[in-house]
Regions:
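Predominantly soluble domains enriched in secretory-pathway, periplasmic, or organellar proteins
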Residues: 1-344
């Protein structure tokens, strides 16, 4: 039976649900502060949990963490912790099954504790030791990897460029200019195209697009216009682009920026182009999206709502809304109640 795992960053919990009924089947509390992303290895049943900062978010956080937790989905126990020091702030995780490597984007430590010290580290899944480290030229928050495990494309947030990394030879191949920066990318099933939502949150003066990178030429081959900002792109088993949309407005009383909308737009590949086929409203800022292997459903974590939306991809409607963590903790400056997702 499938299990849907969702992290509450500010709640420091791993929440387990039956994805069909929507019922909560378990909760692991008191995770290391603060959990961010999830990556499931279906060969071993291990779920890897990244811990990026002790508290806070990308632009305002406490001390970096250098840990990745190992959760056994069979026993439902955290069985180990991977220490990656001196590398700082592991965030996004991907597994190269052919080479038994866990890759993690990091925000520092490769070239010192500077904005330029980020990149990607590779962890041997047998020894759980870091065996690869490749500098990207900036803090790397997210990345995509080609299916053959040869290349990675890093999201460097506000830096204004994407880094192209050779994972085999462990070197930075080149950078691709992306004025305004970017957010969480996706990649086509065959690895031919990577999709970066741009600009990064907080960057003003840029129109929102999905920037499409041709990975054979390492150039931006087209731009898909959007009506509002996008924070993530997930490519499902039918090569549809599921784009997490957001809108931020200024509160009239406090004059602070607040999220006011979240939704998912679906783009269908039509020849070399993409046609928008539907949009559904979800919760506030749909930060992470994954999908069922058959493409029938999408799972959307709404970080500021603390909920997870299950979307019927045939009708583009929300089937269920699961409460992951909707209670704001007084000791947290920002409520981040639903972040990383994994379908186990």
């Amino acid at each position: 039976m499938d299990t849907l795992a969702v992290v509450s960053q500010s709640g420091q919990t791993l929440n387990l649900f039956d994805p069909t009924s929507g019922l909560r089947t378990g909760q692991i509390t008191d995770l290391i502060a603060e959990p961010h992303e999830l990556c499931f290895d279906n060969r071993t049943g291990f779920l890897y949990i990244s811990h990026t900062y002790q508290h806070g978010w990308y632009t305002s956080h406490g001390a970096f963490v250098s840990l990745i937790s190992v959760f056994d989905s069979k026993t439902r126990i955290v069985v180990d912790t991977i220490e990656i020091s001196p590398y700082l702030g592991p965030h996004y995780l991907q597994i190269d099954k052919e080479r038994d490597l866990l890759y993690a984007s990091v925000e520092g430590g490769i070239a010192g504790e500077t904005p330029e010290g980020g990149g990607i580290v590779g962890i041997d899944l047998h020894t759980r030791l870091v065996t690869k480290r490749i500098a990207s030229g900036h803090k790397s928050h997210w990345f995509v990897m080609t299916p053959d495990g040869s290349k990675a494309y890093t999201c460097n947030k506000e830096a204004g460029f994407v880094s192209v990394i050779d994972l085999i030879t462990e070197r930075l191949l080149r950078t691709i200019a992306m004025p305004g920066g970017c957010e969480q990318p996706g990649i086509s099933r065959d690895g031919s195209f990577a999709f970066f939502p741009s600009p990064a949150i907080g960057q003003v003066g840029y129109n929102p697009y999905i920037k499409v990178i041709d990975t054979r030429l390492d150039i931006i081959s087209q731009s898909i216009p959007l009506e509002t900002g996008a924070v993530t792109v997930h490519v499902d088993s039918r090569d549809r682009l599921l784009v997490g949309l957001y809108r931020i407005e200024v509160d009239k009383i406090s004059s602070k920026p607040i999220p006011s909308y979240g939704g998912v737009a679906c783009f269908q590949p039509i020849g070399p182009s993409y046609e928008r086929t539907g949009t559904v409203e979800t919760g506030l800022v749909p930060l992470t999206i994954t999908s069922h292997p058959d493409g029938s459903r999408a799972y959307v974590s709404n970080i500021f709502s603390g909920t997870l939306s299950i979307v019927d991809m045939t009708t583009m409607t929300v089937m269920k809304v699961l409460e992951v963590d909707t209670d704001r903790r007084k000791d947290k400056a920002m409520h981040q109640g639903a972040h990383g997702i994994a379908l186990m």
